[in-house]
């Protein structure tokens, strides 16, 4: 066998082997993920049809207008029919791709109804970890998540340090978590099982390890799990602050109580720097050989008092928004939810206002640039 054939066989085998892998986005376990799979396959098939048509036309024209065929000159200066066709076809292609895509995007942002009894979970990113706070159940987990099957879960995405992206491929698409704001993202698991979630936005050394397990169980098993979680150690502020320190050696933890009792990350984006100071953690060159070198100077116990709830987000102060502090003995009631919704509405207005301001600046700049012509 020639060297070329050997290489061809080798690369062909590699291509076939790739089909043996479990592509998570093509193995959906929720309605949003199923919708995403449909869009992916629809787009691929649509593009393959277009490519096949182009290759067929290319072959036909290559043969028809070959040098040896003296009956066809191949010269054409104008043809209204053909020009209309190759204008209309791309428009049809764009419309055919846009309609299901736009429809899906609107479905993704649709909020669940009260009768659906959605479960609310605050998903907070910090220190290459994910903190999941259950405000109604008064429990918190680190790097693992348990949800009931067939029940919508409203994730309230927040970040306490770098911008990250919350993604559970088998349940749906990703959405960014950023400091100083809260982003809603609703997902539902239609099957029981364990799925993998991750941060899909590169944010440093621990990016590849910022993952979490998602356990989808029946409602009765979820209630049993909540009862067991409430028996765990209470999450106090000292423990939470130490967990905020960046580390690539993360563990799955469960606590009773939540960090919502003493900090609202959206209202107090500077909180994490105070936590660093309490444990003498200093940001250094991240490329250490071992985790011990990275955290060599970190204290076992804090040398400063716990920080009281504060508002350091200028937008909160400017728009009269309140910090969402929910004590471990306080109910996640309608009053709290109303204030929560109010803050979300205000953040949307701020976002829209920023877009309008940016657009007006661009328009003004274009006007000034065009004024001299």
From Swiss-Prot:
InterPro entries: CcO_II, CcO_II-like_C, Cupredoxin, CuRO_UO_II, Cyt_c_oxidase_su2_TM_dom, Cyt_c_oxidase_su2_TM_sf, QoxA. Residues 292-320, 339-373 have a biased composition (Basic and acidic residues). Keywords: Cell membrane, Electron transport, Lipoprotein, Membrane, Oxidoreductase, Palmitate, Respiratory chain, Signal, Transmembrane, Transmembrane helix, Transport. A lipid is attached at residue 20 (S-diacylglycerol cysteine). Disulfide bonds: none annotated. GO terms for cellular component: plasma membrane. The chain crosses the membrane at residues 38-58, 82-102. Gene3D superfamilies: 1.10.287.90, Cupredoxins - blue copper proteins. Its EC number is 1.10.3.-. GO terms for molecular function: copper ion binding; cytochrome bo3 ubiquinol oxidase activity; cytochrome-c oxidase activity; oxidoreductase activity, acting on diphenols and related substances as donors, oxygen as acceptor. It is a multi-pass membrane protein. SUPFAM superfamilies: Cupredoxins, Cytochrome c oxidase subunit II-like, transmembrane region. Its main location: membrane. Residues 1-19 form the signal peptide. GO terms for biological process: ATP synthesis coupled electron transport. A lipid is attached at residue 20 (N-palmitoyl cysteine). Residues 292-373 are annotated as: Disordered. It comes from the Bacteria. This is Probable quinol oxidase subunit 2.
């Amino acid at each position: 066998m020639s060297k070329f054939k050997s290489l061809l066989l080798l690369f062909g085998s590699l291509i076939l082997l790739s089909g043996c892998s479990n592509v998570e986005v093509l193995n959906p376990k929720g309605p949003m993920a199923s919708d995403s799979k449909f869009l992916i396959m629809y787009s691929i098939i649509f593009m393959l049809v277009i490519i096949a048509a182009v290759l067929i036309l290319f072959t036909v024209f290559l043969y028809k207008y070959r040098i040896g065929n003296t009956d066809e000159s191949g010269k054409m200066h104008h043809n209204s029919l053909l020009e209309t066709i190759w204008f209309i076809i791309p428009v049809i292609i764009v419309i055919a791709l846009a309609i299901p895509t736009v429809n899906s995007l609107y479905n993704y942002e649709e909020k669940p109804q009260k009768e659906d009894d959605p479960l609310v979970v605050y998903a907070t990113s910090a220190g290459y970890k994910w903190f999941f706070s259950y405000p109604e159940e008064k429990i918190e987990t680190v790097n693992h998540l348990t949800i009931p099957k067939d029940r919508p879960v409203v994730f309230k995405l927040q970040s306490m340090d770098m911008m990250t992206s919350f993604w559970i491929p088998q349940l749906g698409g990703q959405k960014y978590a950023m400091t100083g704001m809260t982003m809603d993202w609703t997902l539902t698991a239609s099957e029981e099982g364990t799925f993998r979630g991750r941060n899909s936005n590169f944010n440093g050394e621990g990016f590849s390890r910022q993952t979490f397990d998602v356990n989808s169980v029946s409602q009765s098993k979820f209630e049993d799990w909540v009862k067991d979680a409430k028996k765990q150690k209470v999450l106090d502020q000292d423990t939470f602050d130490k967990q905020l320190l960046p580390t690539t050696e993360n563990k799955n933890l469960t606590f009773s109580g939540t960090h919502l009792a003493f900090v609202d990350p959206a209202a107090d984006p500077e909180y994490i720097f105070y936590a660093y100071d309490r444990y003498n953690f200093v940001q250094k060159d991240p490329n250490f050989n071992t985790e011990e070198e990275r955290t060599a100077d970190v204290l076992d116990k804090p040398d400063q008092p716990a920080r009281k709830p504060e508002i350091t987000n200028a937008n909160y102060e400017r728009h009269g928004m309140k910090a969402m502090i929910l004590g471990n003995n306080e109910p996640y009631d309608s009053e709290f939810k109303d204030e929560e919704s109010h803050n979300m509405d205000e953040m949307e207005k701020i976002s829209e206002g920023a877009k309008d301001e940016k657009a007006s600046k661009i328009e003004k700049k274009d006007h000034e640039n065009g004024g001299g012509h």
